[in-house]
């Protein structure tokens, strides 16, 4: 005949509490181990996006003004003479440089979709050719053009715009100025048409 455990743990065994505690510890161990082995990207190299920046327009007044510094890959938002926001950006990559100069916001479109840059996709939604220029790249048979999404677009010169997009730590766009999500919203909401935009090298 087997002996029962000592009195100090007998209540746990009798009431099943020991099993419940062991089960909870095992579940916590399994759940916490999921983060130790993240799923790898399927293909390619994706550099980490840069930090978004900051925004504080409390007690700020005056007209909006945006300054983009290509060398720093930074954008600055002013109200009057007060700097109220700063963010990392990604400007035009080599061959697609963002033109320096003095401009103004001429139009805004929160849900803009490019008619020039995007992908050729088949009827099932599979991307056949990515990152294409529809003016130059021939469309493969059986595909259609799917324009790149450019949320919170503010156009300042022809097809050049500031908009939400992927912001790696280098110039990577087709000439537009990409901003991180929340900062694109802040700039869009606070820059009316006519806002001066200065792009410097």
Where are these regions (language model features)?
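Solvent-exposed coil/turn segments that connect beta secondary-structure elements
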Residues: 71-73, 80-83, 92-94, 108-111, ...
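Bacterial Sec signal peptide processing site at the extreme N-terminus
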Residues: 31-53
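N-terminal post-signal-peptidase region of extra-cytosolic proteins
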Residues: 49-65, 70-71, 85-103, 135-143, ...
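Bacterial N-terminal signal peptides
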Residues: 22-30
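Bacterial N-terminal signal peptides that target proteins for export
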Residues: 4-22
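Short, solvent-exposed cationic patches
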Residues: 101-117
